Amino acid sequence: MPLITLPDGNTIEFPNKVTGLEVAEKISKSLSKQATIISVNEELKDLSFVLDKDCSVKIFTSKDKEGLETIRHDTAHITAMAVQELFPGTQVTIGPIIENGFYYDFSRKEPFTEDDLNKIENKMKEIVDRDVPTTREVWKRDKAISHFKDKGEIYKAEIIESIPQGEDVSIYFHGDWHDLCRGPHLSSTGKIGKYFKLTKVSGAYWRGDSNNEMLQRIYGTSWASQKDLDEYLKRIEEAEKRDHRKLGKEMDLFHFREESPGSVFWHEKGWKLFQKLVAYMRARQEKAGYKEVNTPEILDRSLWEKSGHWEKYGEHMYTSQTPDEKIFAIKPMNCPGHVQVFNQGLKSYRDLPLRISEFGKVHRYEPSGALHGLLRVRAFTQDDAHIFCTEDQITSECLIVTNLILDIYKDLGFEDVILKYSDRPDLRVGDDNVWDKAEKALLDAVKASKLQYTINKGEGAFYGPKIEFVLRDAIGRDWQCGTLQVDLNLPGRLDASFVDKDGTKKIPVMLHRALFGSLERFIGILIENYAGKFPFWIAPLQVVVIPISEEFDSYAKEVNEKINNAGISSEVDLKNHNLNYKIREHSLSKIPLLLICGKKEVDSNSVTIRRLDTNKQENMELNLFLETFSALNKASSN
């Protein structure tokens, strides 16, 4: 007689064992129709799972994250099922869910075409119409290996061979078609619905190793309703228009070359944008009491071994051996260098907190397939800072840092921020009393922000808890940018110490802090958030002065000079093109203001302003223009 406890605390007792679906039916008929999966004592299961003991049960529908993810998982399965029905001989590999969708990797000699994707989609809808029942079987490991080898599915067999001896595996059947899978899954293919779309095909190495075969990865998205699917596809269309790689080319900001993958070639305008952000951050940090330093980009292997990075991060580091057989590594992060700066000279408790910042160039190896414009690079600049403080100062410093980060995001147009707080993992270093202080300090800072936050239990680093700052952009996408991390490990490993009030030497606590994270990545996010139409003070080129004919070139040059002298970035366009051509050209480059100069403007010592994305024009006296827009140009004053 299992006693089922529901999330609201109510209980239902059954005379005999029951399935998850029967529990849903007992609650309500409508719930049983909407149910996708259940959790039993917080473990996700199919609706067909048999409950024969007392347990806690939660029922999920497509409105829940877990329910929607199950729909996407099932859609990945019927993608593979459709492919093998249409293209016999194609081998399946893996098909996980990802954010907003799924993918499935296939081994096939012929490339999938756009026409193939349409055929696969139609076959998937046919499979949904068949409403094929889904069943689960548990097989012995060796049986599963033999079965998939006999079918010619060498990739599935290889996956199962990596499972420990003696461990059983679960196989899900959709009719006769079946796949190795942990589940859970919907009860039939008809439950998936037809609210899916295959979006693209790309290459992917088996197991992410470039030494292995190149597979074909089909991406797709799946939703609970047509409305949700349409809205998502609209967001994707808008995201493509905002793609920073496309806009970066149109706006003449940067480019990449195969000769230096993952490294940015900044053009003049792009570099101006980069420098503006650095100048803005530098000014904000100086006001907040940070001391800016610069540390070497290449450091001896011995320091990386002592810091622990060589063991934990070595595969991502670029190394070089010198003629005297010493091994050096290009830094993938700035923290060991900052500890070396702290260690110069005896430090007292009176010197703390000590806030050290750097715009440090770092290099991290990323597989070529993972590189993505400015958003995923191998060489980038961190707006890194490390705060050395006492245990008693952790709380106040965390509050100060959090407020600074949120204030800067607000200046840059990001007011919708979500915080993710991660506390101690099972495997960790440091005293539990210090962990208590560190966790309370970060959680207090999170709560004081009055922003939405999530708690990720046990997901902190082994050396300390952390906060991640997630920005939501203009089209609803989330970007993880800033971090605040308490470090109870590195200062001790690298012999950092200070003399406390009682004259004893103590190890300082170190706070890792980044606001942008990577400047390159943040610029990519800025471009996409604003679709290249930056706020006036951020824009790399703020004004273009356009004389309507050669007769007014002299006045246009004079205006341009005065604008630049006022601290506003301006150019004058004297090219031999007509006015409409120039307006189109500079509008494509997303210049915020175009100033038209003709006889009327010369006679009245004024300019006619044409703002981006409008046909309206406004005449303004030149001195008033300089006064008005100099005030907006706050990058160097904040």
Curated annotation (Swiss-Prot):
Residues annotated for Zn(2+) binding in this entry? 335, 386, 512
Gene Ontology BP annotations: threonyl-tRNA aminoacylation
- Record text on cofactor binding: Binds 1 zinc ion per subunit.
E.C. number(s) listed in UniProt: 6.1.1.3
Its main localization is cytoplasm
GO cellular component, as recorded: cytoplasm
| Record keywords | Aminoacyl-tRNA synthetase, ATP-binding, Cytoplasm, Ligase, Metal-binding, Nucleotide-binding, Protein biosynthesis, RNA-binding, tRNA-binding, Zinc
Write down the top EC class of this protein: ligase
Catalysed reactions, as listed in the record: tRNA(Thr) + L-threonine + ATP = L-threonyl-tRNA(Thr) + AMP + diphosphate + H(+)
Renumbered to this chain, region (Catalytic) spans 243-535
Known CDD domains for this protein? TGS_ThrRS, ThrRS_anticodon, ThrRS_core
Protein localization: Cytoplasm
The keyword Isomerase is assigned to this record: no
Q: What is the annotated quaternary arrangement, including any partners?
A: Homodimer.
The job of this chain, per UniProt, is described as: Catalyzes the attachment of threonine to tRNA(Thr) in a two-step reaction: L-threonine is first activated by ATP to form Thr-AMP and then transferred to the acceptor end of tRNA(Thr). Also edits incorrectly charged L-seryl-tRNA(Thr).
Q: Can you tell me which family this protein belongs to?
A: Belongs to the class-II aminoacyl-tRNA synthetase family.
Name of protein: Threonine--tRNA ligase
Which organism is this protein's natural source?
Answer: Pelagibacter ubique (strain HTCC1062)
What's the source species' lineage? Bacteria, Pseudomonadati, Pseudomonadota, Alphaproteobacteria, Candidatus Pelagibacterales
> What's the encoding gene here?
thrS
